[in-house]
């Protein structure tokens, strides 16, 4: 097994962490040098710069899945490539929960009454308890979302490409049954990974079957759904609310209709962020480097 020289672009390693990696036999480089053969990076940097980068033996991306990188690229021919699954589960589940509760607790209304200096008690707050929730995609993030919502007493069903057992959902259905059943849910959360099978899966026809009181949340890639249809449904008030963290164009152009929708909350691709991620990222990287040096399969390995 060749020795590794690591460039960590995404995570600034502290002296203690560098010392731990050194004990494994991994040298840390502060810059991208020609003899670097291991990298921890975001997908976008790799996608844009692979042609100019050295050939790698070890690659870990700072995302759960990979949808931006060509795994067959010559610079990755001999590389073991993995993701950082498990790092972002908790912040993303809390993101979804906080925004759904914000709708049910009328946070936007009360924020406006405070700005207007108006005392307007509302009796229209709702509980998450008893609501029917569909979690589409039961990977680690979707499972954490289901766990979080079930704790609040919601009736959670899961939709997944393959059968899976989970104590946090009442029932697991195949993705193919979404068209028949999606209209019954008051909250729909999309947590799917993007690939050839899932691109456009939240189709025009499927979106039009959403319940009129549905809160629709997408923390997967924007390519999973038809944005134009969602805009139409929100403009015409045919669904209650939407929460979006990813978009077909980022940054979102100022002329985009999403900016002016009153029944939409949008955030700039930050649902995964948390200062607690930093330690989880290092532990994920450390574990995978350790497995690589032991010639064992990495966690969340893609090739």
Show which residues each predicted segment covers:
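N-terminal glycine-/charge-rich "phosphate-binding" loop or analogous flexible N-terminal tail
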Residues: 1-41
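Short acidic low-complexity segments
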Residues: 25-35, 48-49, 170-185
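Phosphate/diphosphate ligand-binding glycine-rich loop within oxidoreductases
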Residues: 37-111
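Rossmann-like dinucleotide-binding domain for NAD(H)/NADP(H)
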Residues: 81, 213, 219-303
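A charged, well-structured terminal subsegment
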Residues: 99-124, 276, 280, 284, ...
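Glycine-rich NAD(P)-binding loop of Rossmann-like domains
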Residues: 110-144, 171
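NAD(P)-binding Rossmann-fold cofactor-contacting core
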Residues: 151-168
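Rossmann-like adenosine-cofactor binding region
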Residues: 163-257
């Amino acid at each position: 097994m060749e020795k590794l020289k690591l460039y960590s672009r995404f995570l600034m390693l502290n002296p203690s962490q560098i010392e731990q990696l050194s004990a494994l036999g991994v040298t840390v480089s502060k810059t991208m040098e020609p003899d670097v053969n291991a990298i921890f990076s975001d997908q976008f940097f790799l996608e844009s710069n692979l042609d100019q980068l050295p050939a790698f033996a070890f690659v870990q991306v700072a995302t759960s899945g990979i949808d931006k990188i060509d795994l067959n690229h010559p610079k990755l021919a001999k590389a073991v490539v993995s993701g950082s699954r498990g790092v972002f589960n908790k912040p993303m589940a809390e993101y979804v929960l906080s925004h759904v509760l914000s709708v049910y607790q009328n946070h936007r209304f009360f924020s406006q009454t405070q700005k207007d200096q108006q005392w307007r008690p509302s009796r229209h707050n709702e509980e998450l308890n008893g609501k029917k929730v569909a979690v589409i995609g039961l990977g680690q993030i979707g499972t954490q979302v289901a766990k979080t919502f079930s704790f609040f007493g919601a009736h959670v069903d899961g939709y997944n490409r393959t059968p899976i057992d989970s104590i946090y959902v009442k029932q697991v259905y195949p993705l193919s049954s979404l068209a028949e059943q999606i209209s019954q849910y008051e909250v729909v959360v999309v947590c799917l990974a993007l690939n050839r099978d899932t691109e456009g899966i939240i189709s025009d026809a499927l979106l039009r079957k959403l319940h009129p009181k549905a809160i629709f949340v997408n923390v997967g890639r924007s390519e999973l759904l038809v944005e134009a249809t969602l805009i139409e449904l929100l403009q015409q008030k045919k669904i209650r609310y939407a929460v979006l963290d990813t978009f077909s164009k980022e940054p979102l152009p100022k002329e985009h209709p999403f900016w002016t929708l009153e029944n939409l909350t949008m955030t700039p691709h930050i649902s995964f962020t948390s200062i607690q991620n930093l330690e989880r990222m290092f532990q994920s990287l450390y574990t995978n480097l350790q497995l690589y040096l032991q010639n064992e399969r990495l966690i969340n390995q893609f090739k």
